[in-house]
Amino acid sequence: MKKFGKYSLIICGLLLFTAGTKAQQINNFTVQQAVDYAKKNSVHVKNALLDVLIQKQVNRDITSIALPQINGSAGVTYNIDIPVQTIPNFISPATYKVLIDEGVKNGNGQTITYPAGGFGNLLFPFGTPWVASAGVTLSQIVFDGQVFIALKARNGTISLQERIAELTEENIKANVYKVYYQLVVGKTQIELLDANLNRLEKLKHDVQIIYDNGFVEKIDIDKLSVQIANLQTEKLKANNMIKNGYSGLKLLMGMPIKDSLVLADKLDENQVKEGMLEASQFKYSDRKDFQISTVTNVLNGLNLRRYKLSQIPTFALVGGYSKQAQRTEFNFFNKGDWFTSSYIGLQMRVPIFNGFALQAKKQQARLQLQKTQNQTEALKISIDGEVENSKNNFIAAIATMDFQKKNMALAEKVYDQTKKKYEIGTGSATEINTAQLDLKTAQTNYISALYDAIIAKVDFLKATGKL
């Protein structure tokens, strides 16, 4: 029994370990895989795609207006008090006339005459206590200008929601690119910090030997220790920023925070330089926001036309068929008469006067169309500015990146030469500290220029609609 309990604990532990391992998924993603993952899992993209599906159902609702409308009805009524109709007494006068003409006498032996108070009224109950009915009605729009325009606008509304969804995907893609490569640049920064630490550790080791031989002071070693501590602190901060960056990227992609994310892409400067498109290759229609503006203009034009067509008469076919039974008792399932009624007709509705409401709506639609047209023209100007600025920034960023790369290589060369001079006793501690500081500054500038070039490329591709 004790053995069984021991093995049970082991088995449970293994199961829990297996479950925990499955719960944490490891994702080794290139930037394109990260973008694809975000398109499938980002809440913003999901909701944008749901808006497309919602619009499709709205269009189905609009389409149903143009289809036959068939409604059925059935019911049973019990008349507690049957309605009574009062009519003048037309029976008694005729009876009295016959009696008077024949000279008939009453029981007292007197000749019958017309009563002095008249004959009064007759009371007739119309209906029966129990009434049952069942029927169906049909209506079909033959022509309605507003419905016609609504049907015509269906493709436009779907296109609008699809363009909005694509714009959402594009924004997510741009942000994923920026954060992804920011983390890649961060990894490069860590590599440079490690290289600097190795240099300083080696330099400190060499200076320690020189110090042991009595050629340098203890302060030279202390200065190197301070620099090493500063670099270690900087590396710690950089690693913390990278960890937070991974969390931000997962959040942007819609990935569970507990999952592991590994960046598979390396930083390739030649890849950054690719895509420097000429301005002549740019088209407004490549931009998702311009496509949205274009579709909006079309829909606003249809909206204006809808109000214009609402002044035209509408036509509809109507029809109905019903059965009714009347009983003194609830016995509708027994044999008895059911009376049929049916009709068919054509209805016309003519708008005559609505208090100038239609004129106001038409003017609103016309002004709204003018407004969106103005916004489209303003968007063109804005796009031109974005393309020009992003192109200039991209070119400048590439040039800066190349310059800083050369400058970093030169600073590294200067440091190596200064270190050799210091080791053979022809250089000073100040010179090597300055060279180390210059190298670190050059590396920092290169990292910054590299990231700026990536951001500039993403902004340029987005501005030209090529992202």
What are these regions (language model features)?
Residues 8-18:
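Bacterial N-terminal signal peptides
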